[in-house]
A protein has these predicted regions:
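Structural signal for membrane-spanning alpha-helices in multi-pass inner-membrane proteins
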Residues: 113-117
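Amphipathic alpha-helical segments used for helix-helix packing
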Residues: 45-65
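C-terminal peripheral helix-coil segments that are non-catalytic and often amphipathic
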Residues: 35-36, 40-43, 79, 83-91, ...
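Amphipathic alpha-helical packing segments from all-alpha helical-bundle domains
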Residues: 15-18, 47, 65-91, 101-105, ...
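Hydrophobic alpha-helical connector segments
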Residues: 8, 12, 19-49, 100, ...
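HTH DNA-binding helix-turn interface
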Residues: 1-7
Length: 147
């Protein structure tokens, strides 16, 4: 029932990432790839996911004792982020004093924080536009700037 619907939202997000992955080679840096993924996901959420459904997904992740779909490390989302961040580290673009998994967690926390805020503010601002300001600020902390 409701749990399956909420779980399918995570699946929908992952399907979007699979679709977007084909465009990643258009970007010169892994940083730009992460910003692109965030912007496209936030655009999809803002334009085609009901605020109520997203709020339910986020709230059930807080109270559930069962599956935490958003945190499932086997999701395509996490696999793609790990690959991009590992490549960024290997290419000298991202800092190496943090592990790939730590940086993936930081990125995912930043996205969830923005989604949560957008929900509790009842979508009163553009998620995509705010994300385009906030995510570069957050990602500046993992980026090496002298490349």
């Amino acid at each position: 029932g409701k749990d399956a619907l909420l779980g399918s939202l995570s699946f929908l997000f992952d399907e979007k990432y699979m679709e977007l992955e084909a465009q990643l080679s258009d970007f010169a840096t892994r940083y730009e790839q992460l910003i692109y993924l965030n912007q496209e996901l936030f655009s999809m959420i803002e334009n085609s996911i009901s605020l109520d459904l997203l709020a339910r997904l986020l709230s059930t992740q807080l109270i559930t004792k069962g599956e935490k779909h958003l945190l499932d490390r086997n999701r395509y989302y996490y696999k793609l982020l790990r690959r991009i961040i590992r490549e960024g580290q290997d290419g000298g673009e991202f800092r190496t004093d943090l592990s790939v998994n730590e940086m993936v967690k930081l990125y995912a926390i930043a996205e969830r924080a923005l989604l949560y805020d957008w929900c509790i503010c009842n979508g009163e601002y553009s998620l995509k536009t705010y994300g385009s300001t906030a995510m570069p600020i957050y990602l500046a902390q993992i980026r090496i700037w002298d490349i």
